[in-house]
Amino acid sequence: MASTTPITMEDLQKALEAQSRALRAELAAGASQSRRPRPPRQRDSSTSGDDSGRDSGGPRRRRGNRGRGQLRDWSRAPPPPEERQESRSQTPAPKPSRAPPQQPQPPRMQTGRGGSAPRPELGPPTNPFQAAVARGLRPPLHDPDTEAPTEACVTSWLWSEGEGAVFYRVDLHFTNLGTPPLDEDGRWDPALMYNPCGPEPPAHVVRAYNQPAGDVRGVWGKGERTYAEQDFRVGGTRWHRLLRMPVRGLDGDSAPLPPHTTERIETRSARHPWRIRFGAPQAFLAGLLLAAVAVGTARAGLQPRADMAAPPTLPQPPRAHGQHYGHHHHQLPFLGHDGHHGGTLRVGQHHRNASDVLPGHWLQGGWGCYNLSDWHQGTHVCHTKHMDFWCVEHDRPPPATPTPFTTAANSTTAATPATAPAPCHAGLNDSCGGFLSGCGPMRLRHGADTRCGRLICGLSTTAQYPPTRFGCAMRWGLPPWELVVLTARPEDGWTCRGVPAHPGTRCPELVSPMGRATCSPASALWLATANALSLDHALAAFVLLVPWVLIFMVCRRACRRRGAAAALTAVVLQGYNPPAYGEEAFTYLCTAPGCATQTPVPVRLAGVRFESKIVDGGCFAPWDLEATGACICEIPTDVSCEGLGAWVPTAPCARIWNGTQRACTFWAVNAYSSGGYAQLASYFNPGGSYYKQYHPTACEVEPAFGHSDAACWGFPTDTVMSVFALASYVQHPHKTVRVKFHTETRTVWQLSVAGASCNVTTEHPFCNTPHGQLEVQVPPDPGDLVEYIMNYTGNQQSRWGLGSPNCHGPDWASPVCQRHSPDCSRLVGATPERPRLRLVDADDPLLRTAPGPGEVWVTPVIGSQARKCGLHIRAGPYGHATVEMPEWIRAHTTSDPWHPPGPLGLKFKTVRPVALPRALAPPRNVRVTGCYQCGTPALVEGLAPGGGNCHLTLNGEDVGAFPPGKFVTAALLNTPPPYQVSCGGESDRASARVIDPAAQSFTGVVYGTHTTAVSETRQTWAEWAAAHWWQLTLGAICALLLAGLLACCAKCLYYLRGAIAPR
């Protein structure tokens, strides 16, 4: 498509000013001549105000404001200045008039209705209306209520929320601009197309019409015409604008205007009768019926022909049982038949409904009957008190008189019949020695069971306590609505008409000591009105009515023929320039520089940087706790850095000696040993006063009682050994910390999209590429940051603190809240306390812990040669100077402040339909943990392969789509292991650690005897259709209505082809 140079408002203003100056010069020259004004010419009958006699199919004859009488197509742009000058040169000059000269009069302007009006001003045009008049594009007016060529003079609409339902109609011509020119910011200027051909609207409407707005709310199509709808604000007032868009040429040039057609806007239209035939009441009723059918179909619980679920897997009998139960090993229960809650079962000679006999958890499917060959005893599974038991039954002989007894499964009692037709088994005194729990008599369930009670022995497998949950069951969305018990806790005491509720129970209303439960909106509204403190039911009724009110409002507004003129007779599609997106693709991109993905073009993260405003916070030197010392196999005469120069490094000793709050201690080991040096004991008086008289020193002198002198091996026991230690807080010459404050930080993500670079931020998370638009879900900016630039012995590193410091709170002593010096010479913080020196033996348990704040531990170390020993020094934390030390900075800062916790989300809107690449390799290390056929999701985790998103399937069932890398999800398992997983190609086996549904607990009571026969439920499709004939009839009617609605939508889309792809 050929490109056109955008016409800016500045260029248009310069051209209009030049044309205005020429016009003023021409008018001034004409006014200076002495001539008599011509009488006004009469309008021809074809251009009179009565437009009823003209041909509506052909072009209109219009006269310009110059009165030259030539034909001109006012839908085109004005002629160039060369043609205009040539036409002036061919026109003969007017002859001089003999009338006396008169004063110059204001020029008069043709109004298009046979008259003229004085021009308001002679200066340059100041608004688009004056600019259109100056260009000579003022066609004759016409009555907007009569028929008019819709393409020669088109109509746009404006309406404001501040003025109510008042619609302003703006009639104007199109200039020959083709597609509207775009400015540098991607917007188009509607003032370039403002060429009115109807009544001039008020000034505030013209100002709103020419207000620039780049966002387009939607495109409205009507036949071959296209309208663009916009929302914008002018001076605090919100306006809606419906602009007529020009047609676009397929070859890049402006296409010719379509043939002029005439359309009479009436209440009924003969051209489109389908728009009127289907009104708001019919749409509301049809939508109500369809929604009721959808809700009823989803919740009514239509039963299939047969339950095809797999039979339940029973647990194996426990091994820890008594020897007298060994004969039951060969009597394992057979697999029962599958059925559903619509079947019947035989109890004695009577057939009863299964829902009246079996407990609730069996009604959900998976229940059965286990008939064994032995009539009197057998094994089966009992469910009682949320526990599963593997039970062995023994008949009891009938008692002489009816005696009530209490069961282990329930607290209810039942009377045993007085007589029994068959003798009972003599196993009354059998015990459950090998079983753990679950023993007790079983109450009789049915009157047809004439046998006596049974002793139930079982092994407890699991114990769960699910809470009570309810659901609502609706028949076709109409009342009455029933309450369905999903799970029930017996302790809650919910009853239906006095009968305890079990899972699967359906009841209009449940009662318990906690209150009442119902699904009926009328009852809910009544309960909410009666109990003003609880508005849950009223809110539920309100939420139920809101969708229908919205449907009514939408249908009423969409089906009205008049009201919002052209806006309400079309359908909203999408923004201006109909969308060319084929489809949307979504994937993730990791946040490490160099990560790449395919969506569907290659996207790579080139780097991450952040921008901020930097304020220098100065520099400081941290306190440094430094210690030194020496282990000497004799007593020195001069305890100082000079006297101990042979054992102590000179430079550290001098730096520590000149430091702040110095601590210096001298210990003498074995001062009271016997022998030739025993007289030295008197020198070590507490405080060292005697020693200082003979050996002057500045350190504290302490005797080291109980310490070993093994460090100086090879000497007699009367050897005296000394230990010297020196420590203080110093300013290290090569340790500095500079502080910088970063405000208004903004993270910039540098992406490479198909080779093209693109930067996204939280303010602009989009990338426009030739392939489509990329939207990035970027994390929020970190906010204010504090940067610590630490320089330790030439190794410079930066640490970042999140947020601004609270200098009036807990951060008052931190480095960022102190006064710093530019040359890093100031020590930050108060002077720390004097360090504490302590002599610790090598086998002291104290060495297993860390030194306390401001403590220094010294330990003599045995040397490898005689008279050679060393000293091990351990310094603790910095005490009161902790907050100024590098350790505090590392504990309160991070090395990467803009690293997000998760990946970046990429949403790509493609230009043409493409499909994202899908991984075909199987996932790796997939683990499945949980249970199957138990209604609880199991945990599925593993590693997705590269090459695109993995559409994970587990045993043929879709689990979800995951990007390459580790994934964790939950899925319902319907089959037992083994599990095969794949990503659409080859499959692999996953490791599974699951438990079967028999190990899961349910709510209920003992479901009866093993001798109860359950008839298998089978139902043909004909029987099902005969039982549901009314629902099928209603569904067929709804299907016909839905087909009619779809046909109307298809016809509407057919008529909107001009808006979807304007020609």
UniProtKB/Swiss-Prot annotation:
A cellular component annotation (GO) from this entry: host cell mitochondrion
Post-translational modification: Structural polyprotein: Specific enzymatic cleavages in vivo yield mature proteins. Two signal peptidase-mediated cleavages within the polyprotein produce the structural proteins capsid, E2, and E1. The E2 signal peptide remains attached to the C-terminus of the capsid protein after cleavage by the signal peptidase. Another signal peptide at E2 C-terminus directs E1 to the ER, with a similar mechanism. Capsid is phosphorylated on Ser-46 by host. This phosphorylation negatively regulates capsid protein RNA-binding activity. Dephosphorylated by human PP1A.
Membrane-spanning segments: 535-555, 1029-1049
Bias type Pro residues, positions: 93-107
InterPro entries, per the entry: Rubella_Capsid, Rubella_Capsid_sf, Rubella_E1, Rubella_E1_1, Rubella_E1_2, Rubella_E1_3, Rubella_E2
A Pfam cross-reference name: Rubella_E1
S-S pairs: 153-197, 590-595, 619-824, 641-653, 699-712, 758-767, 807-817, 931-934, 950-983
Protein's name according to its UniProt entry: Structural polyprotein
Native source species: Rubella virus (strain TO-336 vaccine) (RUBV)
